[in-house]
From Swiss-Prot:
GO terms for biological process: cell chemotaxis; defense response to bacterium. Keywords: Antibiotic, Antimicrobial, Defensin, Disulfide bond, Secreted, Signal. This is Beta-defensin 130B. The lineage of its organism: Eukaryota, Metazoa, Chordata, Craniata, Vertebrata. One of its GO terms (molecular function) is CCR6 chemokine receptor binding. The keyword Transmembrane does not apply. Belongs to the beta-defensin family. Expressed on differentiated macrophage phagocytizing plasmodium falciparum-parasitized erythrocytes. Transmembrane segments: none annotated. It is found in: Secreted. Disulfide bonds join C38-C53, C43-C60.
Length: 79
């Protein structure tokens, strides 16, 4: 009887616990760290493309920022 009540309590907790939400997409996280903005497909003429957020979105940042934040050199992929 104890096993039956234990299973029912565990089942109740599993149904009540909300599912975890995923975090920020890695490309968006890197774009935010570089002080950029994710934009659809194209950056404006005042922006420089510094990366890709996800499919169809590019990471853009103003190229004339008074206090420039260095863009890291991408690491090469090993064959």
């Amino acid at each position: 009887m104890k096993l039956h009540s234990l299973i029912s309590v565990l089942l109740l907790f599993v149904t009540l616990i909300p599912k975890g939400k995923t975090g920020v997409i890695p490309g968006q996280k890197q774009c935010i760290a570089l002080k950029g903005v994710c934009r659809d497909k194209l950056c404006s003429t005042l922006d420089d493309t510094i990366g890709i957020c996800n499919e169809g979105k590019k990471c853009c940042r103003r190229w004339w920022i008074l206090e420039p934040y260095p863009t890291p050199v991408p690491k090469g992929k090993s064959p």
